[in-house]
Amino acid sequence: MTHQAAEVAKRRTFAIISHPDAGKTTITEKLLLMGKAIAVAGTVKSRKSDRHATSDWMEMEKQRGISITTSVMQFPYRDHMVNLLDTPGHEDFSEDTYRTLTAVDSALMVLDGGKGVEPRTIALMDVCRLRDTPIVSFINKLDRDIRDPIELLDEIEAVLKIKAAPITWPIGCYRDFKGVYHLADDYIIVYTAGHGHERTDVKIIEKLDSDEARAHLGDEYDRFVDQLELVQGACHAFNQQEFLDGQLTPVFFGTALGNFGVDHVLDAVVDWAPRPLPRVANERTVEPVEEKFSGFVFKIQANMDPKHRDRIAFMRICSGKYDKGMKMRHVRTGKDVRIGDALTFFSSEREQLEEAFAGDIIGLHNHGTIQIGDTFTEGESLSFTGIPHFAPELFRRVRLRDPLKSKQLRQGLQQLAEEGATQVFFPERSNDIILGAVGVLQFDVVASRLKEEYKVECSYEPITVYSARWIDCSDKKKLEEFSNKAVENLAVDGGGHLTYLAPTRVNLALMEERWPDVKFRATREHH
């Protein structure tokens, strides 16, 4: 096996998906602790102190305790290199989350044991299903009261339409939580409370049918053995192929806050989840072990570091190897660029990178030339598919408090739009600036970031726009005719694309009927 193939085989790139408050930030920290990437996990409960969760880095996230932006963390674990992508936990950020899920090979679903499957989890699973992403499941919060575990598995199967195969099974919960039993390998992992901040040696009891196990379970022993018989009779056994096909999820139980069970999940990702997978481009399928470099940008993030006024483009490497100072072709612009200062995200510590392989996520400094969906290669003309822009559902007109700052406002909005955090439209017939978003929180985020990072204060006004549609028409004459007729409702988006802002649903239906040669698109691929 070549050095490159060996490095690719070591890579595991996955994202965490969950409903807000299911414990995603906590589990992220504990995973980093496993990889020794952070020495002490600052519990999310001590939010008021300075120990903010390592992955929630933007000011507004610190205040609200939700991860709004996707951060990327890389850490070593058991001779592997793990790339963990944290996805926004708030329902408003579906676009950002969707794009993040295009950059991973597997996902970890975190469920709150007291609540089970929640709406946000369902939406994220729908996205994973589009690509048959393999899913590992973690039922969290066993240090509190949880629902009946069998009921939780039934719910996963019924609601998420995926087979659930329990790997570990909880022994009690809340104050009676004694640990978990490994179904296939017949041993108990003992839970001891109060070790949330550090890695501790794990106590194991070999064999359920042993005096030690009887002593540990006490009066619960017989009831637990009966429950296990029921579980083993009723539940699916783990099947590696079904897992890789996205049809079955292995289920683990634990408490992220108590730092228990997180290592079992990480072991599952390393042992069972796929190494970097081939990627489909319009031109051909790209294999990760190919010698030539290729990668695509799935996210742009402004101002990751208040000390550096910068924008970072996050790129998933699809093939080949990145070497410091190498020359790459920016396919959309046709320009060759030398990349000497790509970053790796070693738990939000930004480090200069010497080399990286397929599956890794690297950061490129972006001075406004890179867009989401851009492909970089060593010369070949490739464009990777499936990185969409969605038409926003909510619109507001932006009003500037200080008219002298209109340049900063435009610059700020342009950069935030490049990030995909919002969409910005400039109407052809007025000097208005219109923002589009998928959820209300995005407007708050934009206003707070404009104030925080660009020192611009703005407010919003309602505007009658029902929806936006990207205009596509191969007949130039027809397009010109349409543009003249519809000019009152036409705008250009942040990327320079012609957009129709429909005032009502009826208007949109009429226009589509009246102009059959013009395509009104609700999504637009980044390319």
UniProtKB/Swiss-Prot annotation:
Domain tr-type G, first and last residues per copy: 9-277
Subcellular location: Cytoplasm
Positions of GTP binding: 18-25, 86-90, 140-143
Single biological process term from Gene Ontology: regulation of translational termination
Keywords assigned: Cytoplasm, GTP-binding, Nucleotide-binding, Protein biosynthesis
Gene3D superfamilies: P-loop containing nucleotide triphosphate hydrolases, Peptide chain release factor 3, domain III
GO cellular component, one term: cytosol
Major localization class: cytoplasm
Disulfide cysteine pairs (residue numbers): none
One Gene Ontology term of the molecular function aspect: translation release factor activity, codon specific
InterPro entries according to UniProt: EF-G-like_DII, EFG_III/V, G_TR_CS, P-loop_NTPase, PrfC, RF3_C, RF3_dom_3_sf, RF3_GTP-bd
Family: Belongs to the TRAFAC class translation factor GTPase superfamily. Classic translation factor GTPase family. PrfC subfamily.
Job description of the protein: Increases the formation of ribosomal termination complexes and stimulates activities of RF-1 and RF-2. It binds guanine nucleotides and has strong preference for UGA stop codons. It may interact directly with the ribosome. The stimulation of RF-1 and RF-2 is significantly reduced by GTP and GDP, but not by GMP.
Protein name: Peptide chain release factor 3
Gene this protein is translated from: prfC
